[in-house]
Each structure stands twice: as C-alpha cells, then as structure tokens.
Amino acid sequence: RRQRQMCIRDSPCTILQVGPCTITQIKTDDKDGYSSFQLGFDEKIKNTTKSYEGHFKKSKSKTMNKLVEFKGFNGDYKLGDKITVDHFVEGEFVDVSGITKGKGFQGVVKRHGFAGVGDSTHGQHNRMRAPGSIGAGSDPSRVFKGMRMAGQTGNSKVKVLNLKVVKVMSEDNILIVKGSVPGHNNSYITVRK
C-alpha cells in the first residue's frame, strides 16, 4: 500500500507498506498448469462473499481485501505462511506497479502535452487548446489508429522499474524506495524484485 512521499538527504522517496501478506493459494504445474503463489493483503472486516470465505478458510487466514498472484516465486513456503518486508534488502532494486491517479476526460493539451494552435491572431477564435488536423480527407477516408486525441486520462496501470530500496523497517512492515510510485495515498501497489 502506497503511504506518502518524503525526502531523505534531498532525494525524493516514497513510503510503502508491504505486509504482512498471507499465502492464500499455491498453484502447481500438475494441478493448475503453472506454478504461482497467491498473496492476500489488508484484512477485510465485512461484505465477504461465501465463495471467498471458503477460499480463505482453506489457508486458515482471515478474509483479505486484495489478492495478487506471483509467478516464479522462490522460497519454501506453505499455505497460510506470512510474507513480511524482510523479503527485501536495503540497496536492491525493485519494480513497483500501481493504478495512477485518475484525471477524468481531458483535452489534448493536458493529456498529451500539445501546444495548442498558438497565437489568437489571423482571425482565430476558440482554437487555443484544439488538437488541429487529425489527418487527410478523402484519400484515407478514415482516422488512423492511435491518433492522439482527448479522452480519459490517468486511472491506468503503470509499472515503475528499478527503484532503489533506501530503508527497510521490519517492525512496521515499511519499505522506503527512492523515487515516485504511481497512485494516490493508501492505494494498492505491487512490489516485485
């Protein structure tokens, strides 16, 4: 869970709460076709469906808010084991993915950094933040795919690679990484080695 940002010796850092996570399911090659661990995080107090209650009962854990599956997880773990921040070491690099802040429906100037049409001279009006041409006329008779236009901005999954682990605080399950992490405060994130 992303907590907030801070500075350590003039370096921008982000505080992450990364545990304790419970192993709620272990998938194997012979049973599921691939091997992975399913981790649960953030205890859920109410409004859990019966199917999820049964799922968590198998691992003898409390119901969780967030479930994430990790492939290629190294280590000798059993169902119901807890994984804490001690999994990480100071100085190593991690990849963090999360959902960015949603900005709603935005124009091309905010969404893609267009300059707009520019000077309001030569009789122009109401064109300051317009995208301009989106293609030729009757020759293609269509707009090419991928044309940058106005639309939903943010609220998309983004992965930030190679963030350095500055500090590991075992007693609070806090991980401090150098740099920024996508999402708002208290949003769910995934940290991979």
Which stretches of residues belong to each language-model region?
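Basic, glycine/proline-rich low-complexity segments that contact nucleic acids
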Residues: 12-166, 175
